[in-house]
Amino acid sequence: MMPVDVCPRDRGSQWVWLEMGQCYSKKSVVPESDTSERSSMTSGSSESDIPQENKVSKASLDTGQMAFTLAQLESLEICLKEAEEKAKALSEQLSVSEGTKSKLLEQVSRLEEKLEAVDHKEASGGPYEKMVLVKDQCIQKLQAEVKASQEQLIAQKLKHEKKVKKLQTDLATANAITVLELNEKIKTLYEGKPAPREDSLLEGFCGGLPPVEEGDRKISLIMELSTQVSLQTERITQLKEVLEEKERKIQQLEAERSPHPPQEVKDPPGCLPEAPVFSTHDIPPVVSDENL
């Protein structure tokens, strides 16, 4: 509220009260010739009118001041209502902002946790990658060994089949020669003639040896061939066992590699035992008819 003062009266001036609560003075200029007359004429009446004028001016001042005060109160009430509405809207906006801030803080905390988990995973991924690399190297080595063993086994099988076929042919030939000799001996015994010392078939096959020595040599040849066949069969069985063992190890490593979590590598890349590799030099040569 603006202060309202009652304007005083000065000598030679008149104060006027306006609606806005301010006082202004209006000076009146009187000529010098009329001053003495007017003062003498109005001296008596002015002294009697002063209290009445003061009452009227005070009443008018009180009425204007009251109206001005009421207008100010109404304007202040309107301003107060507007301020309350603005404060209410601001409080609502503040509550919404607080809720948004809490949600953002929760999102930030979740993102920080995810970032820490990713950092931890990257930090712990080094040993796992090394272990996977070592296992891959072991698997590749085993696969190469299995491939070499398979190739060697196939070659040994082919060679063994050839030797078996040759032995079967030689055995059939020896049996046929023995049957022919026995038939000749039986025939000569029935006819009563002495058995010939040499035969054309025996000369071509045995080089003219006596029948008794030739039969012993055939028997020894058959025994030696049977021994070689049994040795080769044992070697082939051993190669098959080694191949099956390597395949089991490869399957075990592949099963450990894919579904399970990373584990510590206890053995170096050379942890797996070396599989025995059989060469063709270990197999004894087959005695054929050309060596006889």
UniProtKB/Swiss-Prot annotation:
Presence of keyword Coiled coil: yes
Ranges of compositional bias, category Basic and acidic residues: 251-267
Keywords: Coiled coil
Coiled coil region boundaries: 65-174, 222-258
Region described as Disordered: 28-55, 251-292
Biased composition (Low complexity): 38-49
Name of the protein this chain belongs to: Coiled-coil domain-containing protein 192
Organism: Homo sapiens
Gene name for this UniProt entry: CCDC192
